[in-house]
Design a protein with these regions (language model features):
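Short, flexible helix-loop junctions that flank or precede catalytic/ligand sites
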Residues: 1-193
Length: 193
């Protein structure tokens, strides 16, 4: 949530956009700067992420933050929002990029080909992170994995070849991709872990 908050705050400071967040609970209160920000809380302002997302679309946002993709309805609503031109940020509890893609796809029993096509079309990037203990045991440091949605990745998703994402990720350094293993090695070289 700290990483997403930093992304939203960067947009808020640099761009004149309408940002709507859906959170459970609201963890960080934003003050509108260049952007106009509206924050909605599940349980207080809306019954669920899925219902809140459908309502948010009527508010004409440019950017939507979804606190968590918990269920099929929320995932479907987030994909629809992205398809209609909204920049959607969301969290999903998985261990890696391949797991994130598979979790989204596995949420749907029927219409999986449609979901693969939707996801392949709208996905921009996946950033996975885990917190590792720092050397000396004081504090933690984030270890990242970054998967960028290139045409080749979109094809893997569309064709149902998600088992090849991990090996594809290792070849994507030129496009800005990073595996957790590569980043962990960098953290060790810096003496952080």
């Amino acid at each position: 949530s700290t990483t997403l908050s930093a992304l939203i705050e960067k947009i808020n400071c640099e761009r004149k956009l309408h940002i709507v967040t859906l959170e459970d609970p609201i963890e960080y209160r934003y003050v509108s700067k260049k952007s106009l920000i509206h924050q909605r809380e599940v349980g207080r302002d809306t019954a669920s992420f899925a219902i809140g997302l459908r309502s948010v679309l009527r508010q004409d946002p440019d950017v939507i933050l979804v606190g968590e993709l918990r269920d099929k309805e929320t995932i479907a609503a987030a994909l629809t929002a992205a398809e209609t031109g909204h920049l959607v940020f969301a969290t999903l509890h998985t261990n890696d990029s391949t797991g994130a893609v598979n979790r989204i796809l596995d949420s749907f029993d029927e219409g999986r080909q449609l979901i693969r096509s939707q996801l392949a079309e709208v996905l921009q990037a996946i950033v996975c992170q885990e917190l590792l203990p720092k050397v000396g045991g004081k504090g933690r440091v984030a270890n990242f994995e970054v998967l960028i949605a290139t045409p080749a990745l979109r094809s893997l998703i569309r064709e149902g070849r998600t088992h090849q994402i991990a090996s594809y990720l290792t070849t994507g350094k030129q496009q800005g991709m990073l595996t957790k293993e590569e980043h962990r090695k960098m953290l060790k070289e810096k003496g952080l872990i």
